[in-house]
Amino acid sequence: IVENVFNQLNEVKDKRVENFKKSADQIEEVLGRIVNRADKATANGVDTSSITASANNAKAAIAEARSLITAEAGKIYSVSITAEANLKSDLAKTRETLNGDLLKIQQSLKSARDMVHNTAVTLAKISNINQYEVASSTTSESANQ
């Protein structure tokens, strides 16, 4: 029975780690789109230094979250049971440890998401940001004929 409990704890951990990885990927994807829009504005002469600084902070937060996720993925939760009378408390300690570790990752991802959100808000403050385009260097169809 105890082995089944540990297997379930590790399965929960694995599922949560996968969800955290997906969340980190989504946050990073959104940040990438924000940076691309900021690059368009920069190419058109707009000062985006505050966006760049905010994006760098967000990248650091995402990297920190990913390192926590990687560390958690390598952990295997188990406990050495000293006596049958202590079984319940030993299992509770292990479960609390797992919950604490997962909560740290969740808070780290929330912090990264908030930083990306702040970067997006800073980008939105630039007037007419959607009008900026980067000139393409491709040749037209008529030039090839």
Tell what function each PLM region has.
Residues 17-62:
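Amphipathic, heptad-repeat alpha-helical segments
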Residues 1-27, 68-72, 76-145:
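C-terminal amphipathic alpha-helix
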